[in-house]
Design a protein with these regions (language model features):
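TPR/TPR-like alpha-solenoid signature
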Residues: 2, 38, 75-77, 123-126, ...
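Short coil/turn connectors between adjacent alpha-helices in alpha-solenoid helical repeat scaffolds
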Residues: 5-13, 42-52, 83-101, 129-141, ...
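Residue register of alpha-helical TPR repeats
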Residues: 35, 74, 123, 159-163, ...
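N-terminal leader/linker segments that initiate helical-solenoid repeat arrays
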Residues: 1-39
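Residue signature of alpha-solenoid helical repeat architecture, marking inter-repeat boundaries
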Residues: 31, 70, 119, 156-159, ...
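Primarily a tetratricopeptide repeat
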Residues: 19, 55, 96-99, 103, ...
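Amphipathic alpha-helical segments of tetratricopeptide repeats
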Residues: 25-26, 58-65, 106-113, 117, ...
Length: 275
C-alpha cells in the first residue's frame, strides 16, 4: 500500500476519515483503490451503518478475487466487522452473525499470514475476541496476538503492542487476576508514553487506576484519576469514565459529598455526549 492509512484515520471522527479516504481514492488505482474503499466501508461501520458498509464491500467482491494479499485481507476484515465489532449492539450478536464474523476474521488471518502481513494478522486475531466474549477466550486471543507482536520485526505489528497489552489486562481484570492485569496495564502505559497520542495515554493510565481501585489501593487510584480529570478538563473534554471512578473512589472512602458531586458530573457528561 503506497498510501499511509494511519495518517488518514481519525477513529473519533469517521466522517472526516471518510472524506480523507475519498480524496485519496480520486488519484488511486489498483489494489490501493480497493484498500481505500475497504476503509471507507469501515467508517460506515463505526457510525453503525452496517448496511452501507456491506454494500461497499460487496461491490468489491469481484475485483478482490484477483487482488494482492493486503487488499484481500482488509476486505475480509471489514466484512467481518460488519457482523461483530465494538460498535455492535448486544442484540445484534446472534449465533449466525457471530459465525459470519468468525469466518471472515479467520479468512483474513489466513490471508495475512500467507502474505506475511503481521499487523493485519494481529488485527484479525484481536477481532476474534469480539466473537468469543468470555474473558478466558478474550485472554486466549489477546495472548495469541501478543505472540505475533513479539515475534515480528514489522512496524505495523509493533504498533499493536500497547493495545494488545491493554486487552490482556482487561481480560485478566475480568477474571479477577488483578496483579497480572496491573502489570500489563503498566507496560501499556510505558508504550503509550513513547508515542504521541495523549488520549490513548490517558486511557492507559485510567486502566491502571481502575485496577488499583479493584486491588484496594484507593489513594493511588484517586491520585491518578484526579490528575486525569485535570488533564481532560484542560482540553474541555470531560471524561465520564473518570467521573465514574472518582464517584466510586470517594464512595469507598465514605465521602458522600464528593461522591455525589462526581455522580452529577458524570450524568452531565453523559447527557452532553448523547446530544
Amino acid at each position: 500500500m503506497a498510501i499511509d492509512l494511519t495518517a488518514l484515520w481519525d477513529f473519533n471522527k469517521p466522517d472526516v476519515s471518510e472524506q480523507r479516504f475519498r480524496e485519496a481514492l480520486a488519484t488511486a488505482s489498483g489494489d490501493d483503490a480497493l484498500i481505500l474503499q475497504t476503509q471507507i466501508a469501515r467508517t460506515f461501520g463505526l457510525r453503525k451503518d452496517f448496511a452501507n458498509a456491506q454494500k461497499i464491500l460487496q461491490s468489491l467482491d469481484a475485483a478482490v478475487v484477483t487482488a494482492g494479499a493486503e487488499a484481500r485481507a482488509r476486505h475480509a476484515l471489514e466484512w467481518g466487522r460488519t457482523f461483530s465489532s465494538a460498535t455492535h449492539p448486544a442484540e445484534t450478536q446472534t449465533a449466525q452473525n457471530k459465525q459470519q464474523a468468525r469466518d471472515a476474521y479467520e479468512r483474513a488471518l489466513t490471508i495475512a499470514r500467507g502474505g506475511k502481513l503481521d499487523g493485519l494478522a494481529i488485527d484479525a486475531i484481536h477481532m476474534l475476541a469480539f466473537v468469543d466474549t468470555a474473558p478466558a477466550d478474550q485472554l486466549k486471543w489477546a495472548q495469541q496476538a501478543l505472540a505475533v507482536v513479539e515475534a515480528s520485526s514489522q512496524p505495523a505489528a509493533k504498533m499493536w503492542e500497547a493495545s494488545i497489552r491493554n486487552n490482556i489486562g482487561h481480560a485478566l481484570h475480568q477474571l479477577g487476576r488483578f496483579d497480572e492485569a496491573l502489570e500489563q496495564f503498566e507496560r501499556a502505559v510505558v508504550l503509550r508514553e513513547r508515542g504521541q497520542n495523549p488520549r490513548a495515554t490517558r486511557i492507559a493510565h485510567w486502566m491502571v487506576a481502575w485496577t488499583l481501585r479493584a486491588m484496594g489501593r484507593t489513594d493511588e487510584a484517586l491520585a491518578i484519576q484526579l490528575r486525569l480529570e485535570r488533564e481532560w478538563d484542560a482540553e474541555d473534554a470531560p471524561d465520564p469514565y473518570v467521573y465514574e471512578e472518582l464517584e466510586a473512589l470517594y464512595g469507598s472512602k465514605g465521602d458522600e459529598a464528593r461522591a455525589n458531586h462526581y455522580a452529577q458530573l458524570r450524568r452531565s457528561a453523559d447527557e452532553g455526549a448523547a446530544t
